Amino acid sequence: VNPSNFAYQLAFRPNNYEVGCVATDWEFSGPTTITMHLRQNVYWWNVAPVNGRKFTANDVVFYYDRLYGLGMGYTKPMSTNTAMYALASVTAVDNFTVAFSWPGVSQETITEDMFGPMGGNEEAPEAISAYTSPSSLIITNWHNLVGCGPYVITDWVDGTAMTLTKNTGYWGFDERYPKNQLPYISNMKILIIPQTATALAAVRAGKIDAIDALSLTQAQQMKATNPNMTQLTYPGGPDTIDPKNDVAPFTDQRVRQAMQMALDLPLIASSYYSGTAYPYPSTMTSVFMTGWTYPYSQWPASLKATYDYNPTGAKALLAAAGASTFSVTCVASNASPDLDLLQIIQSEYAAVGITINIQLMDAAALNTMLRAQKNTGIAFGTKLGFTFPPLMGFRHWQSITTLNWDDIHDASWDALYAQALAAPTLAQTQALVVQGNQYEAQQQWNISLPCPSIFAVCQPWFKGYNAQTFSISGTAGVLCMGFYCSRFWIDQNLKQSMGINS
C-alpha cells in the first residue's frame, strides 16, 4: 500500500488494497453474496496425507463448513471462532470459484470478516480426517499440520521457537519485483523470548534479525549502543482514562470534560514521549486510518475547547457539576509500560482537585474485572484510536458487550452501530464510521491521551521489512507471517562485510 494513500502499518487495510491472496479477485454477485475466483496454481505442501495436490474450491467449502457448522457433517460452529456466525452458506460454483452468502449484513461487515486474520487459515480435509476426532476437533501435533503457504513448519519447540523451511512449490511472486518468485529466505526461525532484555541482547549481538513492539526508552537505548541498526516506527494506540460512566460523578459529562481539560497532551507528547507521539486527542478509530476517522484538525473550535488543556476551565466545570474535589481509584495493569505516564496524570489531576489512587493489578485479573463491569472508578486502558477493522470499534461502547466496561447505555450509539452493520455500500459504511467517531468525540466517554509511536529495530542486512503489523510478532502469534516474511530477504554480502557469517 502506498503510505500516501493509506497507512499500511495498521492492522486494518481497506480490502481494495489487499494483494497476494489465494483468491485472484472477488465481487458482490448479490447484495450479501461474495463470489471469489481462486488461483489455479496453488498446491498444498508436498507432505502426507495431501502429497502436494492442487488447492480447489472444495477445500474452501470444507474449511468454512467445518468452522461454522454449515455442512460436511459439521453442525455447530467451532468454539474458537465467533466472528462469522451469520455466514449462511459456502458453495463451490466450479473447481476454482466459491460463493459465500450471508442472511443480510453490510458489505463492509462481510469484507472485514473475509479479509481479517481469521478469514483464511484453510486446513487440508485429508489432514483433518486423519488427525482429528469428535472429541479432539483440532490438530494438536505440529508434525501433522498441512498448508499451502510459502513456508513449511519443520520444527517446533513449545514456548521457545518455530523453524520454517521454504516451500519450493509456492505460487507467489513479489509485487514490488514481479519476476522474483517467493519466498526469498530459505530457512527462518521465529523465537519466543519472554524477557525483552534477553531478546535485545541477542539483537545487539547479531543473533536476531528483527524485533518490534519496543518502547521509546528501549529504542533510544538501542540507538545509543547500536547506531548502525535500522530503526522504524509504526502507529500505536493511545492510553486512555476510562471512567465508569454510570457511577457519580462520571455520569455528568462536565466532569469527564474537566478530566480531559486537566491534561496537557502536547506537553506529554513532547516531554514524556520526546516528540514521537501524536499530541492531540483520538476518537474511536486511529487518526492514521485515512477516510475512516475524525481527526482533531477537522474538529470545530467549540469541540476542541472541551479537550484542550485548560486547568482553570476544568476547575470551573468541576465546581458547576458539584465535584470541586473528589478522590477515585484508578485500576491499571502492573505490566503496563506507561506507569510513569500514569504518575504524570495523577499529578495533573491533583492540580485541579482530583485525587487519583492508583491500584495495580495482574493484567488477566484486571481484564476479567473490567469485562464483568465490576470497576467502580476509572481504569487506565486503551479505548480509543483503534487500528483494527473499524466496525469492531463500535462494540466497545455497545450496550450488550463485555467490551463496554465504561458501562455506556446510549440508544443513539446502538442505533448508529446497527445502521453501520446494515449499510448496503462501502461508502455508506465509511460515512457511518466517521459519524460514529464524531459522536464518540462529542460524548467524551473516555479521556484521551497522546497516541505514541511503537518502535521496531532490524539489522541493516534485513531487507523488505517496514514494521508492518503482525509481520514478525503479535500477541496472538505472527498472524501475517506467511505474507510478509516471504517478502523479506537477507543482504548476505552486507552481512558478511560486517563480520556476521551465520
Outline where the language-model segments fall.
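Structural transition elements
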Residues: 151-152, 276-320, 334-340
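Acidic-aromatic pocket-rim loops
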Residues: 282-293, 364-422, 465-469, 474-476, ...
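N-terminal lobe/hinge region of extracytoplasmic solute-binding protein
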Residues: 1-30, 146
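Surface-exposed binding/hinge segments that line
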Residues: 27-31, 35-40, 73-131, 150-157
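Ligand-site clamp/hinge motif
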Residues: 136-143, 169-221, 355-357
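Aromatic- and charge-enriched surface segment that lines or borders ligand/interaction sites
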Residues: 17, 22-74, 99-104, 199-202, ...
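Extracytoplasmic/peripheral linker and loop segments enriched in polar/acidic and small residues
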Residues: 257, 269-272, 301-308, 355-366, ...
